[in-house]
């Protein structure tokens, strides 16, 4: 017997998925589609810094748009709810306008300005110099930093950030995780450099990537496996680094200790 038309569907979808905490690593968490016959457009964004998914398909002779955070099929994520429990999905925004991409982008921009958290940057956006891009590329030393600090101050910068590499000699990629200053790079300590930054009227900053430990980090070698993401009985690593599991209170204590030490010392 032929299925009634109202229940028919193709079982095909156009879908875009992002997995992980880098929410724009492959695609931006937004989309736009035009109806050229009706001269309308549909646009959307997913307001989430983790895994997300959207899809366009057909059901019961209608097209549908599904916009969401992580899913079980695409991201292997789910949440069981007991009777009386509830769960709020990640926030999304969906809008309709005429068939103008520029108009849709304008409406989305206006919406973003409305939902932005009030903060001092709205009125006073500081000028920040970071020593990584087009400068030291993760190879800082006292000798290299001082002339850059002078130049940044002369340009009117308000913050000066010492980026990656301050914590280890040589190739440091797979040994990060303890966040101790490297005396080979800063013979008199990194405080000499941060004090010099302050003497030039700027606020110092340092790069921290607290969510990872390199596979050759001594602390990672001595830490128990439950500090890290584990799959099939082994630590998960990507590009020679382990990912810390912040569900473990010991991991949070470690991170708090690092921040307190870096800020106060």
Task: Describe the function of each predicted region.
Residues 1-112, 117:
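N-terminal accessory beta-strand-rich subdomains and adjacent acidic, glycine-rich linkers
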Residues 167-220:
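Acidic/aromatic-lined carbohydrate-recognition and catalytic surfaces
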Residues 147-150, 188-199, 257, 261:
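Alpha-helical scaffolding segments of alpha/beta enzyme cores, especially the outer helices
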Residues 144-167, 265:
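Catalytic domains of carbohydrate-active enzymes, especially glycoside hydrolases
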Residues 124-126, 135-140, 183, 210-265:
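Active-site-adjacent "subsite" loops/lids of carbohydrate-active enzymes
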Residues 89, 125-131, 158-162, 204-208:
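Hydrophobic faces of well-ordered beta-strands that scaffold small-molecule active sites
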Residues 49, 94, 132-134, 160, ...:
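Active-site beta-loop-alpha junctions enriched in small/polar residues
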Residues 84, 129, 152, 160, ...:
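Conserved, mostly hydrophobic/aromatic
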């Amino acid at each position: 017997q032929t299925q009634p038309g109202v229940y028919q569907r193709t079982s095909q979808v156009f879908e875009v998925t992002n997995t992980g905490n880098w929410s724009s690593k492959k695609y931006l968490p937004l989309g736009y589609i035009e109806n050229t016959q009706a001269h309308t457009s549909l646009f959307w964004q997913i307001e989430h810094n983790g895994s997300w998914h959207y899809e366009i398909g057909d059901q019961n002779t209608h097209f549908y748009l599904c916009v969401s955070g992580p899913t079980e099929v695409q991201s292997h994520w789910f949440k069981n709810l007991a009777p009386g429990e509830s769960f709020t999905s990640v926030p999304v925004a969906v809008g309709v306008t005429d068939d103008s991409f520029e108009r849709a982008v304008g409406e989305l921009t206006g919406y973003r300005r409305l939902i932005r958290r009030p903060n001092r940057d709205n009125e006073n956006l500081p000028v920040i110099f970071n020593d990584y891009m087009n400068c030291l590329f993760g190879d800082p030393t006292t000798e290299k930093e001082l002339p850059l600090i002078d130049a940044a101050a002369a340009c009117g910068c308000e913050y000066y950030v010492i980026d990656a590499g301050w914590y280890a000699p040589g190739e440091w990629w797979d040994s990060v995780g303890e966040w101790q200053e490297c005396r080979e790079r800063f013979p008199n300590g990194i405080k000499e450099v941060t004090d010099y930054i302050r003497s030039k009227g700027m606020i110092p900053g340092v790069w921290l990537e607290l969510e990872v430990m390199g596979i050759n980090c001594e602390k990672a070698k001595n830490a128990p496996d439950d500090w890290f993401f584990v799959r099939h009985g082994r630590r998960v690593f990507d590009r020679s680094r382990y990912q810390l599991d912040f569900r473990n209170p010991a991991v949070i204590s470690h991170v708090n200790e690092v921040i307190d030490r870096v800020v106060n010392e």
